[in-house]
Amino acid sequence: MNIVITMGGLGYRFQKAGYTVPKYQIEVKGKTLFEWSMISMDAFKKETFIFLVRKEDNATSFIENECARIGISNYKIIELDRLTKGQAETASLAIPYCDKDKPIFIYNIDTYVEAGQMTDDIIIGDGFIPCFKAEGDHWSFVKLDSNGNAIEVREKTRISDYCTIGAYYFRTAQLYQEIYDELYVKSGYLEHGEQYIAPMYNWMIQHGMNVRIQDIEPKYVHVLGTPEEVEVFKNLKN
């Protein structure tokens, strides 16, 4: 399996809050946000990881050291020399480095899901989206039919209670590339001004593919995408 970790964002909110290092290098409870995020992927440590990071972050040695400590040995680091149009484009830049016939599992760098929740034995369907239930409209949302099949996925439009955690599975890396090209490259489509991954599943659904979700209990999900969320996590009792 190809594990793609998107780290290409600017982290404006953390900069405004006074942080002077990239978001994923911030330390909370003795671990960097990078390490907390990678704990989520503990079941996949033997797979091939591809990290996409801003070149100006000079983060290669940081990632190498973190991977050595965590136990991730098979990885590539791709440095980006420009800001992308969103997570979907960032992930697409990893495709040339993937085994295109193998599945691709894309994850962000600012969510900690407790170890053991995301495992490869629960993945089903042509597409698979780990979700949890949370309040607010700032998530991607997945609507299901009565059989548990995804029938619609929307960014920042609350069509259901199932919120994505920022992890996205596609049956093959080649399939991801084909959908990305159809939805974003050929049509120039944007959702809320960006190229998000979530809407790509609508293309799959419209073309008869099966998209499923995982419903993770909220107590196992710790979102670390803003300074406020980091403070909440800091104050959680172990």
Predicted feature residues:
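Conserved alpha/beta core of the MobA/IspD/sugar-nucleotide pyrophosphorylase nucleotidyltransferase superfamily
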Residues: I3, C163-N238
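Conserved core of the sugar-phosphate nucleotidyltransferase
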Residues: V113-E191
